Amino acid sequence: MEEFQVYLELNRSRRHDFLYPLIFREYIYALAHDHGLNKSMIFFENQGYGNKFSSLIVKRLIIRMDQQNHLIISANDSNQNPFFGHNNNLYSQMISAGFAVIVEIPFSLRLVSYSQGEEVAKSHNLQSIHSIFPFLEDKFSHLNYVLDVLIPHPIHLEILVQALRYWVKDASSLHLLRFSLYEYCNLKSFITPKKSISIFNPRLFLFLYNSHACEYESIFLFLRNQSSHLRSTSSGAFLERIYFYGKIEYLVEVFYNDFQNNLWLFKDPFIHFIRYQGKAILASKDTSLLMNKWKYYFVDLWQYYFYMWSQSGRVRINQLSKYSLDFLGYLSSVRLNPSVVRSQMLENSFIIDNAMKKLDTRIPIISLIGSLSKAKFCNTLGHPISKPTWADSSDSDIIDRFVRICRNLSHYHSGSSKKKSLYQIKYILRFSCVKTLARKHKSTVRAFLKRLGSEFLEEFFTETEEEHVFSLIFPRVFFTSRKLYRGRIWYLDIICINALVNHE
């Protein structure tokens, strides 16, 4: 029992004193500057975090606070207080940015020390969105069912604050965070953070959300590792940990001593959990009955342990062979790849039908066309239209914009099993570019193309350097006349989802 208690016990060494009065002192700026917190954010350079929020904003916060000299704040007098007057949004941004810098200090230092090791290249690769797909190719073909989980949001802001109590021992920091959340966010805008993101630092919001998710994922990891015993343990017994530990001790002793040869019936090594964009995937080789058990484990865990309202309808059980999973801009499914093998034994020959499971990743063409339609590159049917807002730019600038979008989409969707949909997207962008240029020069599309020749805009279909290398390695199988590499390529340098890919 002590082993399980140690496992569930959070690592107390990770707790830090985030004294929020530090943001009012001069030396916190020196601390942040000396450790190079901005440079340590190596995985978020493309998001422009270092350009908008840095340790310099903490310096400005210190100066502004000293000038205002309003450190004692009353929530009832927030409308009259000059600290929360017409500059309330500005001060909220400064406070949230300063708080984000403070809470990220230990994590940034840990990241810097880790990046100085020999495995820095590996850590970069693991940050890529595409790094999960080779894992799915290896694992999903052996699995049967998948739970498509819509993660519930906390029903109260206090839950997010309390999620930090294992990480932050200083009550003052929690009071500052609690005050800021209640002062500037209501529950509705926080669940759909379009308004709150403009006020609060996005990294602070993500830090709170991930800290909360870390708690229930650590318990789920315990469930996953002990799934061989939990199959005969109800969720109610799990929540009452005394009975839970007692039942596990009994099961371990009985199974190990008397039924050691039959342990494989109760173990489940083929279970995998992935969390992304407020959703989660639980894939397993279990039967539908056992997957239904996992479904109610999730619901009960969220409702009774983390006080998050959840219903069984938010967790759907699907069979991988009959279901396409909408996952990170791809429709992923497991399909059978039939093959016929002829075997010869002496004078007799046999025809053997062999079907192998293979992960199929396709582009959600309908959703992607919908995204292109919202961006005014085509209509709802996928017919290209001109981009009038770009008609005032130079020809080279217009072409460069379209080519850059086309290559970004090609780069992200390079792992598609079927390139026909990708070619259709390139076709839409190519003729949208032509129509935009024709609109600018007050000409028709046919006359414009006839004047420039058929080689115009060939760079839309020009292969990238990576595709050129693969075409040299596999020239007969994978290289086509359209200069499209037909094999799947997963790039390990993609850390952000393109806005057109994230069509939701």
Swiss-Prot record:
InterPro entries attached to this UniProt entry: Domain_X, Maturase_MatK, Maturase_MatK_N
Subcellular location: Plastid, Chloroplast
tRNA processing among keywords: yes
Gene Ontology MF annotations: RNA binding
Alphabetical keyword list: Chloroplast, mRNA processing, Plastid, RNA-binding, tRNA processing
GO (cellular component) term, any one: chloroplast
Transmembrane annotation, as ranges: none
An annotated GO BP: mRNA processing
Major location (coarse): plastid
Alphabetized HAMAP family for the sequence: MatK (MF_01390)
Functional summary from the UniProt entry: Usually encoded in the trnK tRNA gene intron. Probably assists in splicing its own and other chloroplast group II introns.
Family of the protein in this entry: Belongs to the intron maturase 2 family. MatK subfamily.
Full protein name: Maturase K
